[in-house]
Regions:
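A glycine-rich phosphate-binding loop feature that marks nucleotide/adenosyl-phosphate handling sites
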Residues: 116-118, 217-220, 382-392, 439-450
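Histidine-centered divalent-metal-coordination microenvironment in nucleic-acid enzymes
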Residues: 40-42, 154-167, 338-345
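Terminal catalytic/cofactor-binding subdomain
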Residues: 2-147, 154-160, 187-197, 201
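Substrate-recognition/cap regions that form aromatic- and gly/pro-loop-enriched pockets
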Residues: 332-333, 339-427, 431
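Loop-rich catalytic cores of soluble enzymes, especially ATP-dependent carboxylate-amine ligases
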Residues: 22-23, 131, 135-148, 152, ...
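Short conserved micro-motifs at the rims of enzyme active sites and ligand-binding pockets
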Residues: 52-55, 91, 124, 174-175, ...
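Extended, compositionally biased alpha-helical segments that mediate assembly or anchoring
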Residues: 433-541
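Generic recognition of stable, solvent-exposed alpha-helical segments in well-folded globular domains
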Residues: 36, 92, 96, 137, ...
Length: 541
């Protein structure tokens, strides 16, 4: 079924590109879309606080395991799927992987929400360990630096990352049909960066539709004190919040903004160079902290960014990486390989942390962003985009909330309906290619949330907590236990189980081999690694 609302006028340039996909390209090219998931989960002890145990040996070694590793903390697990051509296959893999992990997890839960609980401060959050190899030390020291610069608490907020790309065979055909690019690679990079800019423009929509962090445990804040209103004695919240994770209590680079960094998304080259400049430019606040103390590294360097990953963004254009290659250098070398959408909260209501309806919608959303007109983003618009994201994160369900668009005020409902209505041609095409009505159904469900904010996950959470007289901790623990039961009861095929066993055994073998390969000191290793960034960076004109 389609929306009962009148659809606004849609740009002809966008429709003409959709028409190219319909008429000039093989449907198999859209069926070949590559989809991968990365889902973070905090391990929590049976007493309710962050787990202080090591990453389980039965999960493989976090340095070399490609499907199950750690993020910032030893307690923050990351489940990673390979790329699949269908979201259902990616979700099945994620379900099997989490079920497999649970079967060897002793007296601990995988936390069901993005926001953590019962933290007891920075000193109680163990930083992930990767062994004594140079690459392992680099990963650990980078995390030490994050904790030093921003505190450890915000680093254990969990999220879901959606990785998406079109098949390589798509780009020669699409480029030829457009008739305006010198190579398929130029077309690919141009259109992926168009996508990134439009995701940033409409980025507030993702926390509005899928945000699931309107409340937070008081232990998240120093001394349990916050400027946020109290929900109960153990919980802070905002009544119209959608995603405090994406708000100003979450992981943001506010300090970097003060240091003058802004990623430039107007081309692959400008994006890579803006990050390279930040990685090679000293920052006085970080210099004051010191790079090492008594011979031990505290951070990788004292520059604005230690490495590219430190720059927080809703979306990243990602390259195919060679071993020990800097991501920004790889982008300059080989262009964009896939898009990583990073703004999804963990879906507290689903045992996997994300569901099929969300992913079908996101597939269509990214394709719409790619095909829509996408002018460059100047500093004024960038400020608007940041303000819109924060406004929706903190008060997105507020009645009659207004956002800023091109210097003018626009209601969230009006803008949201315009954006979603533009997706119908894409959803109709994807449903035609794949059969059924999954994409249009997913879109209709999101339009329902624009019309009725009480249908959003953030509204459901607060209503449920109120109805149950439940703290955020009580809510999160109840759902964590419910999801644990679901995952432990799941049957995994013998073939899939054997595949996981093999990957985990291989990760331990690879780690052992890696430990014996280093032929240089850690100081020399870092110098050699960062030499590539200094060689590639251009001074700003």
């Amino acid at each position: 079924m389609s929306s009962p609302h009148i659809r606004p006028v849609i740009a002809q340039s966008y429709l003409s590109r959709v028409q190219i996909l319909k008429e000039k390209l093989s449907p198999e090219l859209l069926k070949g879309t590559r989809i991968g998931l990365e889902k973070e989960s905090l391990r929590v002890s049976d007493k309710g606080g962050i787990a202080l145990t090591n990453h389980p040996h039965t999960w493989g070694h976090p340095l070399t395991n490609t499907i199950l590793t750690t993020d910032y903390s030893e307690a923050l697990a990351e489940f990673i799927t390979p790329a699949f051509s269908d979201v259902g296959d990616a979700l099945d893999y994620l379900a099997d992987l989490q079920s497999y992990a649970y079967q060897s997890l002793q007296k601990e839960l995988l936390w069901a929400t993005s926001m953590p609980c019962v933290l007891y401060g920075d000193h109680n959050i163990p930083i992930a360990e990767y062994g004594d190899s140079n690459i392992g030390k680099m990963k650990h020291v980078y995390r030490e630096g994050l904790g030093l610069r921003y505190g450890r608490v915000m680093q254990v907020i969990a999220g879901v990352h959606f990785n998406w790309s079109l098949p390589e065979a798509f780009w020669p055909e699409f480029s030829k049909a457009l008739g305006k690019y010198d190579s398929p690679e130029e077309c690919r990079d141009t259109y992926y960066m168009r996508l990134v800019r439009n995701v940033l423009r409409g980025g507030w929509l993702i926390p509005y539709l899928f945000g699931a962090s309107p409340a937070v445990c008081k232990s998240f804040f120093p001394n349990g004190v916050s400027h946020l209103p109290k929900f109960d004695d153990a919980t802070y919240f905002e009544p119209y919040a959608t995603s405090l994770r994406m708000g100003d209590i979450g992981y943001q680079n506010s300090k970097e903004e003060g240091l003058g960094i802004r990623a430039d998304y107007n081309s692959v080259e400008s994006y890579a160079q803006s990050l390279l400049r930040a990685i090679t430019t000293p920052a006085e606040p970080w210099q004051r902290l010191g790079v090492s103390e008594e011979g031990e590294y505290r951070q990788l360097n004292a520059n604005i960014l230690q490495i590219e990953n430190e720059y927080y963004s809703q979306v990243r254009p990602k390259p195919a990486l060679k071993r020990l290659q800097s991501p920004a250098v790889a982008l300059l070398d080989s262009g964009v390989n896939y898009i990583e959408l990073r703004s999804l909260d963990v879906n507290a209501y689903h045992p996997l942390g994300v569901d099929e309806v969300q992913l079908r919608f996101l597939e269509a959303w990214l394709l719409m962003c790619m095909l829509s007109d996408s002018p460059s983003i100047d500093e004024s618009e960038n400020r608007e985009l940041n303000e819109n994201l924060l406004a929706v994160a903190h008060r997105g369900r507020e009645p009659n909330i207004q956002l800023r668009r091109q210097g003018e005020s626009v209601s969230l409902q009006e803008w949201g309906h315009q954006l979603l209505s533009q997706m119908y041609p894409i959803c109709e095409l994807l449903d035609k290619v794949n059969g059924g009505s999954n994409y249009e159904d997913a879109l209709d469900e999101q339009i329902g949330k624009i019309i009725r904010p009480q249908l959003t996950p953030s509204a459901r959470m607060l209503t449920e907590m109120e109805d149950n007289a439940e703290s955020f901790y009580g809510f999160a623990q109840r759902l964590s236990k419910k999801h644990q039961r679901f995952l432990l009861e799941r049957d995994i095929s013998d073939e899939r189980r054997a595949q996981f066993d093999q990957l985990i055994a291989k990760s331990h073998e690879d780690f052992a081999a890696l430990s014996n390969q280093d032929s240089e000191s850690f100081d020399q290793f870092l110098e050699n690694y960062f030499a590539q960034t200094y060689a590639a960076v251009k001074t700003e004109s």
